[in-house]
Amino acid sequence: MSKISEAVKRARAAFSSGRTRPLQFRIQQLEALQRLIQEQEQELVGALAADLHKNEWNAYYEEVVYVLEEIEYMIQKLPEWAADEPVEKTPQTQQDELYIHSEPLGVVLVIGTWNYPFNLTIQPMVGAIAAGNSVVLKPSELSENMASLLATIIPQYLDKDLYPVINGGVPETTELLKERFDHILYTGSTGVGKIIMTAAAKHLTPVTLELGGKSPCYVDKNCDLDVACRRIAWGKFMNSGQTCVAPDYILCDPSIQNQIVEKLKKSLKEFYGEDAKKSRDYGRIISARHFQRVMGLIEGQKVAYGGTGDAATRYIAPTILTDVDPQSPVMQEEIFGPVLPIVCVRSLEEAIQFINQREKPLALYMFSSNDKVIKKMIAETSSGGVAANDVIVHITLHSLPFGGVGNSGMGSYHGKKSFETFSHRRSCLVRPLMNDEGLKVRYPPSPAKMTQH
């Protein structure tokens, strides 16, 4: 038996022992994870700096703080969520107990991603632990420093059998997917998401797939362009554009395209200076392969700003493209880099049509001072989530589930939705053995004639 199979077998045995069932045990494990973050914060920040060139402030406020907040929220709310939930009774069930009981699914596989390798690996794990599951954790091999660190420190704080960390690349992930799990959560590309779902189908394992897509950003003529462009520039170029819910491209009327370019440039210079390469706040591309892919998308385009790169350091300058042809390569795949195309449309209706002709994105953004424009855009399009007059922040809230639709994924998590995703809501009816006389009508033999209703 391979090491991977042995780890999954131990996780299954540990879950079957029943020790994750008591809420106190789950809370103890969440508190241990809390201590891990607090005591290993410098090591976590160092790994993020090595993998993605994140400085201490960005590492903490883009990744670490959200996990700490999620843990605190789970600990606070767990007794309420885990309690049996009474449901409405009928006249025939007045003497019965009717309720929904949340039970853990079993052994959950969480396959993390590299762009936010701490947050997007550990935050789903928090929900799975709170729901009482065993969790097999597979960090992304591309963020190798974080993957190595997690494999070292998690066993020092959490139950070693219940929460194993498996490192490796495609061969190890392929082997993992041959095992039987009770739920799989994967964050990454649509192509790999299809592979995950195919593997899960063998055992009818439910999946949560957090995928990507080209998240549109419509900028209406009727809005404060200074504010809009500052917020767009922040969300797009954070982490060097490597954010699954980053605005992928802008849709706007041609009459305001030049204004948008100038205001984006102004914000970028305020954020990162004249040379973003020297900025401690500006990230780097994760790998040489991704660097070449993103640089290739710029070729042949009309560059209004940036467009340069340094392969040795995997740096790509903040780049704005104008008058982009919707059929060009940069509009055919999720960019996942610091390149912002602008596509011109003549009306709100044309923007909606443009969005609806493409796969459903993970996020949809719009900037307008007109509530009717915002309501129309939301009503007539589909996406995993929406933010109006801002970007990205909707995924940071406990109260809003984070997930995709169609090609951008299925299922969701965050806050209470995480607990529900990793739980089976079991319908329960408990009936007394007395009063069987009242049930005689259901027993054979049935009457020869139907009575009048």
From Swiss-Prot:
Output a single Gene Ontology CC term carried by this record: endoplasmic reticulum
Record-listed N6-acetyllysine modification sites:
178, 194
As its record notes, the protein acts as a catalyst of:
an aldehyde + NAD(+) + H2O = a carboxylate + NADH + 2 H(+); octanal + NAD(+) + H2O = octanoate + NADH + 2 H(+)
Quote the catalytic residue positions. 210, 244
Cite the Pfam families for this sequence: Aldedh
Q: Which UniProt keywords apply?
A: Acetylation, Cytoplasm, Lipid metabolism, NAD, NADP, Oxidoreductase
> According to the UniProt record, what happens if one changes residue 329 to A?
In allele ALDH3A1*2
According to UniProt, the tissues expressing it are described as: High levels in stomach, esophagus and lung; low level in the liver and kidney.
Q: Which residues carry this modification: N-acetylserine?
A: 2
Has UniProt tagged this entry with the keyword Oxidoreductase?
yes
Q: How does it assemble?
A: Homodimer.
Protein role: ALDHs play a major role in the detoxification of alcohol-derived acetaldehyde. They are involved in the metabolism of corticosteroids, biogenic amines, neurotransmitters, and lipid peroxidation. Oxidizes medium and long chain aldehydes into non-toxic fatty acids. Preferentially oxidizes aromatic aldehyde substrates. Comprises about 50 percent of corneal epithelial soluble proteins. May play a role in preventing corneal damage caused by ultraviolet light.
Question: What does the entry list as the binding residues for NAD(+)?
Answer: 188-193
Protein's name according to its UniProt entry: Aldehyde dehydrogenase, dimeric NADP-preferring
**What InterPro entries is this protein classified in?**
Ald_DH/histidinol_DH (IPR016161), Ald_DH_C (IPR016163), Ald_DH_CS_CYS (IPR016160), Ald_DH_CS_GLU (IPR029510), Ald_DH_N (IPR016162), Aldehyde_DH_dom (IPR015590), Aldehyde_DH_NAD(P) (IPR012394)
Enzyme Commission identifier(s): 1.2.1.5
A single GO BP: aldehyde metabolic process
CDD domains per the record? ALDH_F3AB
The record's similarity note reads: Belongs to the aldehyde dehydrogenase family.
**What organism, scientifically named, is this protein from?**
Homo sapiens
Q: Where in the cell is it found?
A: Cytoplasm
What parts of the sequence cross the membrane? Answer: none
Q: Which GO terms describe its molecular function?
A: 3-chloroallyl aldehyde dehydrogenase activity; alcohol dehydrogenase (NADP+) activity; aldehyde dehydrogenase (NAD+) activity; aldehyde dehydrogenase [NAD(P)+] activity; benzaldehyde dehydrogenase (NAD+) activity
